[in-house]
Structures are given as C-alpha cells and as structure tokens.
C-alpha cells in the first residue's frame, strides 16, 4: 500500500474548499498500485480530451452552456460523478500522481495548461458567490464602502471595461489584492493599481483564481522535481509506471508502446518463442499444456495480447480453441465470453482495459508455492524460474546471469532475458512493461530484415556490375 501524502489542516472550511479546488493540501489516504495506474491513466485521458475539446472550441470561437456541458460530461466519463463517494479520492490522487510524473517531463507545460482549462470549466459551473467565499483566506479583500466612495472615479474605469453602468454596481462588486498576484490582469487592463494594491471587478475573479493556480503549479512542480530522487528510492514501482505513460496528445487510452499492427490467433505461438517476455511465455505455455488459465492470468495475458494487436474477433477464436480441450463452445460462451468482451470495452462501463505494466503484474503475483502461473516469474520461486529457463533451452551462462539479476530487480532480470533473446540489440533502458518487451523485439527483427534486404540488394548490384564489366 502507498500513502499519498500528509494532510495539511486548514483553518476554515471555506479555505479548505479553495485548497481542494487548487490542490494545495496533499491528501492523506492509502492506495495501491492498481488504483494509481487506473486513476492516472483516466486523468491523463481526460486531460487529452479536454485539450482537444478546447482546441475545437477555440477554432469555432465557441463558449456556450453546451460547451460547459461537454466539459462536465468528459469529467464524469473519466473521473465519475462529483456526487460519487470516490470522486474526491480519484480526483486528488490522480492529480497529485500526475504532478510527480510531469514535474520533469517535456509535457510539463501541457499539464499545467490543461489542468488550468479543467479548473476554469469547473469554475464556470460554480456559483460566483460560493467561489469568492472559498477564497477569503487568501487575503483577497472585498472593497469597503468607504474605499468605494473614495476611489469611485478610478473604479468607474473597470465598470466601463465590463460594459456596465456605474449606477448598476456598488462596493460588493470590487476586490483588492496584492498587485504582484495578477500581472496578467494588469497587462490586459482588467485591474487598476491604487497605492500599491490592485483592484478588480468581480467578473474577473475567476481569471485571478486561474492565474494563481498556474503560479502555484509551477512552484509545486519545482518542489516535487527537487525531491524526486528520494521519491524514486521510496517508491520505485511508481516511477517505473510513469515511464509507460504515453506522450500528451497521443490519444491512447492506456500506455501503449508503438505496436499498431494486427496479429492473428495463429501468430501467437511463433511470437511467444521469439518476442514474449517471460511472464507471458509462462502463461501461454501453461495455457497450451493445461487448456486452463485462472481469472487473473486471463486478464494479464488477454490484455497483453490485445496490446500487441490481437483484435476482438481473433481473441474470441484464440481463447475458444485454447479452452477447447476441457469446455464446449456453449460452456465457453457462458463462462468466458463476457470477460473477454469486457476486456475489449464491449461490456460494463465500456472501459477499454490496457495491458498490465510490470509494477501491476508484480503486485498481482501469487505467493511462492502457489501453482498459479500469472504474475512476475522473477520474484517467485527461483527453482521454478530455473526450470523454465532450462525448458526454454537457455544455456548455463545465460541462466546464471538471469538468476543473479533477480537479486537486483525483476526488471534487470527481464532485460537480461531480452538481451539474450536479441543479440546485439539497441535497447538502452530497462524493460518495465511486457508490451515494451514485445515492441522492442518487433523493432529488433524489423531492423534485421532491413539489413538483410539491404545486403541482398547490394549483392545484386555487385552481380550486375560484374556482368556489365564482362
């Protein structure tokens, strides 16, 4: 279990609301890697969709109540309804974890901008009076009647900027705050400075909140970046997971690693011998031998196959044949069809499940002694791992190297296995996702084919040249 952080107590419920809105106080609750992975990916997808929707609306110069509804529907789709009991936990956990992922990423500015768009939309859906009351603890003061009368002529400029009549407003429509808090509003002439303090019209209050949020996010990400080495040592599996996140704008709903080519059910067997990581090879071989794979194994192996390009129709046929030694077609439809459809997002909440990452597979590994075959083989019985290496024909030297590497980390051992399967490869970092293993293998064999074709082409040119010389 991971603890997300320590709770900071606020002085008032209103400031709590503001801190929650701006994600200022780190929440305090227990969570596991499965929650972190799913919540982070859902928020990442939400931000991607928010960014695309914002671009569309900007191009259309649109900003209507329907647009606000579109944003609200996006949030509900990925984070759930704000009325749900788990919404606050999912919202805060996913935000803070993505901060850690983005603090030193090239997508950092995208993250800040898109989170700001999300906040702006939430503000648009909130009552302005409620928002203002939430920020009383920030030192943003309403203008007193005395100040209003004293500076009425100056404040009249802001009223004209808002296309209103001075007779329609009073002191409650204005706020003052330190001028350094809102340089953008000053630059755009939406604020005036009187005796070192900035005065704004109430309609610009939301802009002030957004600007404050952006400044705070830059500060917070810098602080996290400075502390990331310690966090990496304390939660290495978390940092490993972040490396599998797609780039902003990829449009993928889960960490995907480059494979877009479809495969057929007939391809699974030969690919298992050349390009499957050990965890998937163990499950596949067991499935072939026993015509059985427990629920967790079916999830891990099934989503892996989907990730390497096995379409839904092919997956149905693959699993039907795999279980045919012990179940009829009718029993297969009753026992397994729904779960396969569910994995492909065709049942339930239409969630298109992603391949499991290494941290998640490790967290799901059965205890030593269990006869279950799912999970990470590098953290389970060394005797069983050694026997599997022998079965695969891995020589003594390579076998010892892999077994020794398990003492360092399962990722190091998995990378050793990859290197032995793919001599003279160009892999430059540790394997941290089964689908990364597969995709790197595909790249390896693609490169070999290209070199082979280039060599054949070169030989043919030499032959033709030799004939011409004769």
Swiss-Prot record:
Under Pfam families, the record lists:
DNA_primase_lrg
Gene Ontology BP annotations = DNA replication initiation; DNA replication, synthesis of primer
Q: Does the keyword 4Fe-4S apply?
A: yes
Binding note for cofactor: Binds 1 [4Fe-4S] cluster.
Q: Keyword check for Glycoprotein, yes or no.
A: no
**Which cofactors are reported in the record for this sequence?**
[4Fe-4S] cluster
One cellular component term (GO) for this entry is: alpha DNA polymerase:primase complex
Q: Cite the Gene3D superfamilies for this sequence.
A: 1.20.930.80
Q: Where is this region: Disordered?
A: 449-470
The name under which this protein is listed is DNA primase large subunit
- Keyword field: 4Fe-4S, DNA replication, DNA-binding, Iron, Iron-sulfur, Metal-binding, Primosome
What's the family?
Belongs to the eukaryotic-type primase large subunit family.
Q: Name one GO molecular function term.
A: DNA binding
Give the superkingdom in one word.
Eukaryota
Q: What does this protein do?
A: DNA primase is the polymerase that synthesizes small RNA primers for the Okazaki fragments made during discontinuous DNA replication.
Alphabetical list of InterPro entries matching this protein: DNA_primase_lsu_euk, DNA_primase_lsu_euk/arc
């Amino acid at each position: 279990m991971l603890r997300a952080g320590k709770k900071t107590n606020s002085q008032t419920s209103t400031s709590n609301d503001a801190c929650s809105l701006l994600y200022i106080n780190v929440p305090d609750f227990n969570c596991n890697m499965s929650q972190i992975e799913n919540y982070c990916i859902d928020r990442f997808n939400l931000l991607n969709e928010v960014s695309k929707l914002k671009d569309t609306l900007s191009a259309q110069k649109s900003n209507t109540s329907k647009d606000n509804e579109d944003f609200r529907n996006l949030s509900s789709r990925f984070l759930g309804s704000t009325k749900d009991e788990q919404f606050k936990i999912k919202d805060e956990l996913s935000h803070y974890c993505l901060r850690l992922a983005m603090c030193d990423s090239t997508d950092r500015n995208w993250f800040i901008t898109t989170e700001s768009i999300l906040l702006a939309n939430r503000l648009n859906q909130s009552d302005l009076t409620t928002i203002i009351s939430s920020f009383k603890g920030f030192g943003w003061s309403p203008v007193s009647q005395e100040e209003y009368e004293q500076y009425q002529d100056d404040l009249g400029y802001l009223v004209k900027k808002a296309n209103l009549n001075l007779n329609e407003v009073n002191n409650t429509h204005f706020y003052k705050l330190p001028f350094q808090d809102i340089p953008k509003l000053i630059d755009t002439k939406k604020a005036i400075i009187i005796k070192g303090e900035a005065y704004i019209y109430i309609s610009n209050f939301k802009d002030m909140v957004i600007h404050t949020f952006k400044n705070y996010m830059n500060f917070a990400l810098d602080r996290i970046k400075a502390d990331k080495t310690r966090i990496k040592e304390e939660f290495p599996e978390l940092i490993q997971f972040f490396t599998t996140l797609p780039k902003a704008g990829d449009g993928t709903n889960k960490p995907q690693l480059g494979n877009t080519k479809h495969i057929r059910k007939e391809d699974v067997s030969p690919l298992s011998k050349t390009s499957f990581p050990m965890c998937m090879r163990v499950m596949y071989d067991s499935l072939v031998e026993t015509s059985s794979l427990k629920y967790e194994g079916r999830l891990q192996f099934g989503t892996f196959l989907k990730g390497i390009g096995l379409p839904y129709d092919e997956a149905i046929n693959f699993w039907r044949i795999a279980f045919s030694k012990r179940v009829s077609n009718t029993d297969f439809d009753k026992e397994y069809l729904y779960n396969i459809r569910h994995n492909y997002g065709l049942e339930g909440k239409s969630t298109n499940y992603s391949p499991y990452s290494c941290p998640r597979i490790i967290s799901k590994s059965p205890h030593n002694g269990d006869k279950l075959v799912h999970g990470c083989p590098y953290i389970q019985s060394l005797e069983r791992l050694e026997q599997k290496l022998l079965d695969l024909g891995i020589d003594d030297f390579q076998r010892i190297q892999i077994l020794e590497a398990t003492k360092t980390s399962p990722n190091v051992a998995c990378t050793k296995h990859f290197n032995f399967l793919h001599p003279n490869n160009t892999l430059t970092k540790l394997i941290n996702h089964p689908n990364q293993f597969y995709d790197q293998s595909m790249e390896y064999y693609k490169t070999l084919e290209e070199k082979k074709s280039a060599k054949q082409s070169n030989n043919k040119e030499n032959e033709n040249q030799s004939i011409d010389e004769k």
